[in-house]
Amino acid sequence: MYSKITLVLLFPLFLSSQIIIPNVGNGWRTKVQQAIEVIKKYDLHKYNVLTDECKQIDFGLASFATSDGKSTIILPVEVLNRGCINDIAACLVHESLHIQFSKAGNKLGEDFEEVICYRWELDFLHNVPNAERWLISNALYQIGVYSTR
């Protein structure tokens, strides 16, 4: 009896921690789920930020990932079609920090916030064994670009 009551009471908590991922595209949901598992496996802190801040992941035609600043991350179709799981994971890590800043009301300035988010992403990539060199190079490049603005 107690186990049924406990299950009923805890079930909404379980549901609230799930990120909604639409089942569209050619295996996109699976790729995003794999990326989330990579984050969980190699950086539990960043995984917790992602699951605390992001409630939904959508897909868009922009050439870069973005967020609504509230709880939704929009991944570029181009990134999903490329199929690099670590690239998808890096986007999720980066954008979840933007959401956290937005929810906290931080007014860091756009360029400074990008530097922090790319450093956060870079830190994640350094935790992933055999992370693609081009992902690390891109994060370093973006840190340089946004640092000099």
Feature map (PLM): residue ranges:
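Auxiliary, metal-adjacent structural segments of Zn-dependent hydrolase domains
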Residues: Q18-I73, V77-L80
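Post-HExxH zinc-binding segment in Zn-dependent metallohydrolases
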Residues: E110-V145
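Short pre-active-site segment immediately N-terminal to the catalytic Zn-binding motif
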Residues: L75-L92
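Flexible, surface-exposed loop/gating regions in the mature catalytic domains
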Residues: G105-L108
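Sec-dependent N-terminal signal peptides
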Residues: K4-F14
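Active-site recognition of the HExxH zinc-binding catalytic motif
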Residues: A90-K103
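Extracytoplasmic/secreted envelope proteins and their assembly/folding machinery
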Residues: V32-I36, A90, Y118-E121
